[in-house]
Amino acid sequence: MRCSCCQKELIKNLTLLELFFQSSHRCFHCQQLFTVIEQKMACPGCGRPNSVELCGDCLQWQKQIGFVLENRGLFYYDAGFRKWIEDYKFTGDYRLRGAFTAELNQALKNYRDYLICPMPLSMERFATRGFNQVSSCLELTNPPFHFLLARKELAPQSEKTRAERLKMEQPFTVKVPKEKIRNQRVLLVDDVYTTGRTLVHGAELLYQNGVKTVKTLTFAR
């Protein structure tokens, strides 16, 4: 057996539960990269850790757009997670897409009646990177997913300041007929929740096109 993150040989005595039920098998080193967010201790809006009431950012969004995203973050966006996303997303180590498949699968069970939609890359960004960092992880999970949105080419989010991200223009268009999503529930999935601007844009557009409910799930917060 190999570590689901670094792919090194993993020497581990499996329990009966691990034999019969899927779990992420990570070596000791890789296990330290991911700190799970305790959902009961997270903001009920954006999922910010250690904020059991709506945080200041969510209250500001509520004033600005009239609703609050219901986001769930799986892991802390800390040094360990940043190391993973640097190696996976920016360096392009595609093997790392399976690092937390079991945790992702478990989280998706809470959205059984939702259309799962990974946040898209622009065609130019996809051509440069060679893969969508979100859909590549979702490919290893059980539920099907759908590309409901398309993205225009804009400057990468990682190159923008917080203020610039918050002022970003609507980068998405809906790529399916309205009839396909009208009165549906949609789960938007992204890698990291930073300001929330990207996910808010996606949610706003879906609501404008008749979607009943939009929730979001991010790998890190």
Features from the language model and the residues they span:
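Glycine-rich phosphate/pyrophosphate-handling loop used in enzymes and phosphotransfer proteins
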Residues: 1-221
